[in-house]
Swiss-Prot record:
GO BP of this protein: apoptotic process; DNA repair; DNA topological change; embryonic organ development; hair cell differentiation; nucleotide-excision repair; protein localization; regulation of mitotic cell cycle phase transition
Protein name as it appears in the record: General transcription and DNA repair factor IIH helicase/translocase subunit XPB
PROSITE patterns: HELICASE_ATP_BIND_1, HELICASE_CTER
Organism from which the protein derives: Pongo abelii
Any GO MF annotation of the entry: ATP binding
Quaternary structure and partners: Component of the 7-subunit TFIIH core complex composed of XPB/ERCC3, XPD/ERCC2, GTF2H1, GTF2H2, GTF2H3, GTF2H4 and GTF2H5, which is active in NER. The core complex associates with the 3-subunit CDK-activating kinase (CAK) module composed of CCNH/cyclin H, CDK7 and MNAT1 to form the 10-subunit holoenzyme (holo-TFIIH) active in transcription. Interacts with PUF60. Interacts with ATF7IP. Interacts with KAT2A; leading to KAT2A recruitment to promoters and acetylation of histones.
Residues modified as Phosphoserine: 686, 751
Matches recorded under SMART domains: DEXDc, HELICc
Amino acid sequence: MGKRDRADRDKKKSRKRHYEDEEDDEEDAPGNDPQEAVPSAAGKQVDESGTKVDEYGAKDYRLQMPLKDDHTSRPLWVAPDGHIFLEAFSPVYKYAQDFLVAIAESVCRPTHVHEYKLTAYSLYAAVSVGLQTSDITEYLRKLSKTGVPDGIMQFIKLCTVSYGKVKLVLKHNRYFVESSHPDVIQHLLQDPVIRECRLRNSEGEATELITETFTSKSAISKTAESSGGPSTSRVTDPQGKSDIPMDLFDFYEQMDKDEEEEEETQTVSFEVKQEMIEELQKRCIHLEYPLLAEYDFRNDSVNPDINIDLKPTAVLRPYQEKSLRKMFGNGRARSGVIVLPCGAGKSLVGVTAACTVRKRCLVLGNSAVSVEQWKAQFKMWSTIDDSQICRFTSDAKDKPIGCSVAISTYSMLGHTTKRSWEAERVMEWLKTQEWGLMILDEVHTIPAKMFRRVLTIVQAHCKLGLTATLVREDDKIVDLNFLIGPKLYEANWMELQNNGYIAKVQCAEVWCPMSPEFYREYVAIKTKKRILLYTMNPNKFRACQFLIKFHERRNDKIIVFADNVFALKEYAIRLNKPYIYGPTSQGERMQILQNFKHNPKINTIFISKVGDTSFDLPEANVLIQISSHGGSRRQEAQRLGRVLRAKKGMVAEEYNAFFYSLVSQDTQEMAYSTKRQRFLVDQGYSFKVITKLAGMEEEDLAFSTKEEQQQLLQKVLAATDLDAEEEVVAGEFGSRSSQASRRFGTMSSMSGADDTVYMEYHSSRSKAPSKHVHPLFKRFRK
């Protein structure tokens, strides 16, 4: 008996741990398929075996990292474990940061010192935008305060020696394997599988190698001018020149010259069979030469150009230009992911990419609201005619005839069950089109199975992923490198905030003490109803009501988020505010959102988790969170993004947006809250802890008497376990919803007292396996 109890306890603990760190879609995360082809070098890690560790676990790097004489003038520390630390107060910070964003993953970026980490995937992304192995090692040596450890040099060479050397280019609708290294092409052609993929002429002989020469600009962007930072001349003025070592000074002077000069590149290529592209890509990955996908859209004469251009009023911000420069080079488009904060203008980046390629474009979002907003963005920023935009959702199915830009959702394309006749016709049309560009919005949310389904259903030459939070709790996000492409650019949240491109947000965690009656029940109950008890805590309700009243007096626009539908309805109905959740119709949603934007009498709305992503509400400047999804870092960042859009007439020095997370004290919610804040803290945000809201006692608030609190408690206790569960959003991939759920019930439930209906289903006999049934009995059943 003891063993069984212990096993049950272990099972419960594992479930609890899983819930704390889970994401909405982590079960079917990218890379769960063991057949996914990934270069073996991608799994390599920096070797730390030579590092001494003292009795407290601290690492001693003194012997491996001798300081240079002029170390105070250099901005980087490169540790033997692959972590790089950057001084944000260095005079050459702008240049060093641009270089580190290209070669490493950001770990933490507070005010004064930033932390990055070298990974195989980040180095793969670096070579994909044109950096060579020698460039990376040379720049690191020059910028580092110490000698760069040999292990780091070996790791960089291992990961970059073959990456980025070979490209798959589509020219005149013919596929070519291209490289600027003739020896690599010869090495690939010695492989029998690749020789089989090579195109042959009518006599059965392999086509000749093609040698081309073209001019291109340096892959390193001139960060200073593009990011609003100091130019080289300003950094190297007479006063500052003494602070910068001569080799760094000469290096940046040379870097500016390289930026202005065009360099000549000679490439060797051979044509391959179109039907064997997938096999070719897998074989090249196996040979440690992964193919970088590039689309020569200017020379694509088969697919017609579409009539689209940016309006003169569309002015790109410096960081948006920089991200697009990483995507477009030498007149070609690279596939990859661009990471920008919520509210920083990801949609404009997508529209500009479509205007640059000027081929048929397919945009995929994660909700019907997202589809409507993308259509509005295309009409706002580009010259495209309304008749050329086609929407494909469950509510809106525009006729695709003469369409240049199609906008749909992942669930519509990945739908596997029977469709209506009209939807089937649109799907057939989507499949037959050859798309120049596919824009994947909120790219972090899609599981691998859905990716493969979407990517095999529609054919696109170039794929651009857009997201604000390239994080997942299961660390499978890195597999997007080979599903879409490498990370092309990632912006610094704090820099954008300081430059006024996004709002300056005051983040606060408000601690709400549990009322004695609620806490007594919370300790006693072990079911999911505990979630309802700390969400419906009367003191949390009062804090929420006080904050709404306070900010409505300031004419602020307030969004209140709740993952739990029971709590959402109770709060909204009690406070007489409009609310949006899963079953709310599309028409009602748009009406509520339009009123919130333009009606001065509607200043507060309540939204469930359907509003986590793709809700464009630039007017909102206050967000209150009353319940959330476990310890999800991504959800916290996405919700902060609802108030991140730059405000009109804002002063950069003052806080102009507020993010409140209401937490019931001494409950599991406090542990979840700490975990949720990790991503935002890593971006440089700080959370202020408020234990008492000043002026709350003077306000006339609900649940101020024991009787009212007792009535609320009885209502919560009368709720079912189903009410304690989070909302399941329709079309949400990888959610753990199923058709059946196990929960405690009562006999009154069986008779329909709480709107529950007891039903039994019997599977059809015709569907039962009958291969082992004797033929004689089969005849009797007919």
